[in-house]
Protein backbone atom coordinates (compact mmCIF):
# COMPACT_ATOMS: atom_id res chain seq x y z
CA UNK A 1 0.00 0.00 0.00
CA UNK A 2 1.94 3.06 -1.21
CA UNK A 3 0.43 5.70 1.10
CA UNK A 4 -0.52 3.53 4.05
CA UNK A 5 -3.82 3.94 5.83
CA UNK A 6 -5.18 7.49 5.72
CA UNK A 7 -8.18 7.15 8.03
CA UNK A 8 -9.76 4.55 10.27
CA UNK A 9 -13.54 4.35 10.65
CA UNK A 10 -15.17 2.13 13.21
CA UNK A 11 -18.54 1.35 11.60
CA UNK A 12 -21.31 0.41 14.03
CA UNK A 13 -24.82 -0.79 13.19
CA UNK A 14 -27.12 0.69 15.83
CA UNK A 15 -30.67 -0.68 16.11
CA UNK A 16 -31.64 2.60 17.86
CA UNK A 17 -29.80 4.98 15.52
CA UNK A 18 -31.23 8.15 17.08
CA UNK A 19 -30.29 7.23 20.63
CA UNK A 20 -26.80 6.12 19.63
CA UNK A 21 -26.23 9.29 17.60
CA UNK A 22 -27.43 11.51 20.45
CA UNK A 23 -25.18 9.70 22.94
CA UNK A 24 -21.94 9.78 20.96
CA UNK A 25 -22.50 13.25 19.43
CA UNK A 26 -24.31 15.17 22.15
CA UNK A 27 -23.15 13.47 25.36
CA UNK A 28 -19.56 12.52 24.47
CA UNK A 29 -19.07 15.54 22.19
CA UNK A 30 -18.02 13.90 18.94
CA UNK A 31 -18.36 16.46 16.15
CA UNK A 32 -20.56 15.53 13.19
CA UNK A 33 -18.53 15.63 9.97
CA UNK A 34 -20.94 13.98 7.56
CA UNK A 35 -24.44 12.57 7.32
CA UNK A 36 -26.03 10.57 4.54
CA UNK A 37 -29.27 8.73 3.97
CA UNK A 38 -30.61 6.06 1.68
CA UNK A 39 -34.20 5.04 1.02
CA UNK A 40 -33.94 2.64 3.97
CA UNK A 41 -31.61 4.25 6.47
CA UNK A 42 -29.18 6.82 7.74
CA UNK A 43 -25.51 7.11 8.62
CA UNK A 44 -23.65 9.86 10.43
CA UNK A 45 -19.86 10.15 10.58
CA UNK A 46 -18.54 11.54 13.85
CA UNK A 47 -15.05 12.88 14.46
CA UNK A 48 -13.49 10.99 17.34
CA UNK A 49 -10.13 12.77 17.21
CA UNK A 50 -6.99 10.83 16.46
CA UNK A 51 -7.70 7.15 15.88
CA UNK A 52 -5.42 4.23 16.61
CA UNK A 53 -5.86 0.49 16.28
CA UNK A 54 -4.80 -1.26 19.47
CA UNK A 55 -4.23 -4.98 18.99
CA UNK A 56 -3.71 -7.14 22.05
CA UNK A 57 -3.73 -10.81 22.88
CA UNK A 58 -6.29 -12.43 25.22
CA UNK A 59 -3.91 -12.26 28.19
CA UNK A 60 -3.46 -8.50 27.87
CA UNK A 61 -7.21 -7.99 27.38
CA UNK A 62 -7.87 -9.98 30.57
CA UNK A 63 -5.27 -7.90 32.46
CA UNK A 64 -6.84 -4.60 31.34
CA UNK A 65 -10.30 -5.86 32.33
CA UNK A 66 -8.94 -6.87 35.74
CA UNK A 67 -7.37 -3.42 36.29
CA UNK A 68 -10.36 -1.42 35.04
CA UNK A 69 -13.30 -3.57 36.18
CA UNK A 70 -12.00 -6.33 38.45
CA UNK A 71 -13.17 -9.17 36.22
CA UNK A 72 -13.28 -10.23 32.56
CA UNK A 73 -16.08 -8.31 30.82
CA UNK A 74 -14.92 -7.12 27.39
CA UNK A 75 -15.82 -8.88 24.20
CA UNK A 76 -13.81 -8.97 21.00
CA UNK A 77 -14.01 -5.17 20.55
CA UNK A 78 -13.85 -2.39 23.15
CA UNK A 79 -13.79 1.30 22.23
CA UNK A 80 -11.47 3.48 24.34
CA UNK A 81 -12.05 7.24 24.18
CA UNK A 82 -9.64 9.74 25.69
CA UNK A 83 -11.49 12.56 27.47
CA UNK A 84 -10.35 15.62 29.41
CA UNK A 85 -12.21 14.68 32.61
CA UNK A 86 -12.98 10.99 33.05
CA UNK A 87 -15.20 11.47 36.10
CA UNK A 88 -17.39 14.14 34.48
CA UNK A 89 -17.59 12.26 31.17
CA UNK A 90 -18.55 9.07 33.00
CA UNK A 91 -21.27 10.88 34.96
CA UNK A 92 -22.65 12.43 31.75
CA UNK A 93 -22.59 9.09 29.95
CA UNK A 94 -24.43 7.32 32.78
CA UNK A 95 -26.99 10.14 33.01
CA UNK A 96 -27.59 9.66 29.27
CA UNK A 97 -28.26 5.94 29.65
CA UNK A 98 -24.90 4.16 29.53
CA UNK A 99 -24.51 1.30 32.01
CA UNK A 100 -21.65 1.80 34.45
CA UNK A 101 -19.49 -1.32 34.68
CA UNK A 102 -16.71 0.28 36.72
CA UNK A 103 -16.16 3.83 38.01
CA UNK A 104 -13.07 5.88 37.13
CA UNK A 105 -10.08 3.97 38.48
CA UNK A 106 -6.41 4.97 38.37
CA UNK A 107 -4.43 2.43 36.36
CA UNK A 108 -0.78 1.37 36.70
CA UNK A 109 -0.11 3.23 33.42
CA UNK A 110 -1.24 6.58 34.99
CA UNK A 111 -4.63 7.07 33.46
CA UNK A 112 -8.05 7.36 35.05
CA UNK A 113 -10.29 4.80 33.32
CA UNK A 114 -13.99 4.00 33.62
CA UNK A 115 -15.83 1.21 31.85
CA UNK A 116 -19.33 1.49 30.43
CA UNK A 117 -21.76 -0.40 28.26
CA UNK A 118 -22.82 2.20 25.71
CA UNK A 119 -25.49 2.44 23.05
CA UNK A 120 -25.32 0.13 20.04
CA UNK A 121 -23.73 -2.61 22.14
CA UNK A 122 -20.32 -0.93 22.39
CA UNK A 123 -18.28 -1.47 25.51
CA UNK A 124 -16.48 1.79 26.28
CA UNK A 125 -13.45 2.82 28.26
CA UNK A 126 -13.39 6.55 28.98
CA UNK A 127 -9.85 7.49 29.95
CA UNK A 128 -8.03 10.60 31.13
CA UNK A 129 -4.24 10.73 30.95
CA UNK A 130 -2.91 11.79 34.37
CA UNK A 131 0.69 12.49 33.42
CA UNK A 132 3.81 11.57 35.37
CA UNK A 133 3.52 10.65 39.05
CA UNK A 134 4.59 13.41 41.38
Regions found by a protein language model. Give the residues of each.
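Vicinal oxygen chelate
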Residues: 1-9, 31-80, 90-117, 129-134
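Conserved active-site tyrosine of GNAT-family acetyltransferases
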Residues: 20-25, 93, 121
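Short, contiguous alpha-helical
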Residues: 119-126
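A conserved hydrophobic helix/loop-capping motif in glycosyltransferases and polysaccharide synthases
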Residues: 11-13
Amino acid sequence: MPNGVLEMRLVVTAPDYGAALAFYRDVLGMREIGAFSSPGGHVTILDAGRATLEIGDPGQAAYIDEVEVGRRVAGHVRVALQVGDAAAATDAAVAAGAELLAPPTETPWRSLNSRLEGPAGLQLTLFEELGPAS
